[in-house]
Amino acid sequence: MPGHPRDRAENPAAGRRRTIWGEGLHRPQRRFEGRGRGHHAAPATRTHDRWTAAQRRRVLPSVRPDYRAPCGREAGCDCHAPRPDQPRRGDRIGSGRRRAFGDSQPSDLRHRNPHGGAVHGHERAKRTTSIRTGERPVKLSILGARVIDPVSGMDQVTDLHVEAGKLTAIGAAPEGFEPTQTIDAAGLVAAPGLVDLNVSLREPGYSRKGSIASETRAAVAGGVTSLCCPPQTKPVLDTSAVAELILDRAREAGFSKVFPVGALSKGLEGEQLAELIALRDAGCVAFGNGLSSFNNTRTLCRALEYAATFDLTVIFNSQDRDLAEGGLAHDGATAAFLGLAGIPETAETVALARDLLLVEQSGVHAHFSQLTSARGAALIAQAQARGLPVTADVALYQLILTDEALIDFSSLYHVQPPLRTRADRDGLCEAVKSGVIQAISSHHQPHERDAKLAPFGATEPGISSVELLLPLAMTLVDDGLLDLPTLIARLSSGPAAALRLPAGKLSAGAPADIVLFDPAASTVAGETWLSKGENCPFIGHCLPGSVRYTLVDGRISYSR
């Protein structure tokens, strides 16, 4: 890598390059060639030729000098892949210039294989992932696993026995039980299948971005056995016909279980109430309007009262439309330095305070999705202390990244609501640890490549991440922010309880939705890629943990 201290002995000229990213890291040359530069889009108007020491201290403290060092996991991984809060390994090669997302590459990192997705060059000849679908539930024994069940509090090494799609016994096998298949799970952790409350399947309407088959297939690779899909489809999920279509195609795909979230208003326009009872009968487990605000607060209040009458769950994505309009990043030092329009913290807290008051008035069971600020988490904690029936979730990347990730105008970090400050990230982590936020979701939003090949403000927001949900979440354990049982609870029983789903537990007679993973192994993100959306900033990173098996209703939907 040009400019790195170890290169200067061989190439004295490399040491003369101006290092502004901290020791050993130089700012890459910017290219303006009359087109978008992918996730390295051209800055709006401001020049960056001079960085003061104060700016470096305030804006760039997260860039680490140990870039491209071995990941240092206890298992002895020497993959030299960066951690998820470091720059991507594939972003700087050869000459040191930044490669645009989607640029053709002569070698390995983004090579597409005939099965779809991206693999390293040395993996082209073989697929490391074996997907078996369409099988009937197997008669299976899982032997010697560390079984963690947050609902019962179990955390011990024991056996699991599965028959006819159900978990028949934990510990000793039932009398006369003869498995047709056994898994030696010594050293593995067996946990309830993960439950993800926010996975955009992109179908119907946006098949260029993803499909129900591709995204549920990616979900089981991340250990997800049950997921909720939001109503932002085309047509909008505001009729029973659309809900039935999604469920039929999910059953045909045969991977994760899908629980649709219906639209609270017709067309998500915030004017007329959708047919909530018909949607519930068609299989919708909750209702929401996404980031689309109601035009009239009285209409929203009536919708909540109606939902409370039938004990329906309403999902809020609290963001004030006027305060957030036109914003691209958190309104702070990074946005000011980059010249990006900001979205203040109050865009969340103002709307959240209003929504909590309406929940208190109506008595509806409410779930607040995609919290981004520490003050927002504090408002949820106060509401729970008052006895309000409210729960909350946070996108996993909000617990890992901050707005400092935008410093190179990478559109891979363009998300809505935006990444916020370190203080917000730390506050959210503390809320997850204490249980105020009881669910962690991927907020999976797959995009085609063209969606990110534009200047930053013209790109579509979102990160494709459901395939990495468990390995990414394991970074919180590696960093000492959560212990493993707490993490499993926030990924399984917590989200299941929030939306009252029949999932997230290991008990005799329960559906055999199980994830088996190796906490001591590592995953290099992108070695295999099953989602249609490759808009993931973590590709090329070394992540702790590796999913070995995912069982859905007793079927092995994924094995590695």
What residues fall within each predicted segment?
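Glycine-rich phosphate/diphosphate-binding loop of Rossmann-like nucleotide-binding domains
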Residues: 1-41
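C-terminal cap of metal-dependent C-N hydrolases
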Residues: 455, 511-560
